[in-house]
Amino acid sequence: MYFNNDIKINKFINRSDFNNYLNCMFRTDSSQNLTNDLTPKNKCYTMDNPEDTGVFQLDLKARKVVKNGFFDQWNHDVDHLFFARVECPRDDIFEWNEYMHKEMQSILRDMQNRHYYPVLIVIHNDQPKDSCHFHILLDYIDPDVNL
């Protein structure tokens, strides 16, 4: 097992909090203190698409456009959006592997069973001194509410 079982699902305080989280995920914050030459190794997935979006292959300006578009699309839903950062506590692993990917899929299925649906998944591989981790943006869909 690679990841902690104790995954805390957090609620956004407001739209600004949501925007800050997206900046962290997309590495588009103004300070750029986490962006480095390894940032293109990060991966970004949307909903049920198993293919990397390639957003981290883009330069900062283009990533900001993508992030802002995503924010514009989702910022009115912040009242039912949540987020989680899932850590790998093992200090001997810094690169993702296929087994971690499978475990991540299992975690995502478990969240869906609890009515939290992944909208965006970002794997950060650009912090070699930090543990492997991934971020999930989740949309909670209450099963008791008729749409």
What are the language-model segments listed below?
Residues 1-132, 138-147:
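Positively charged, glycine-rich low-complexity segments
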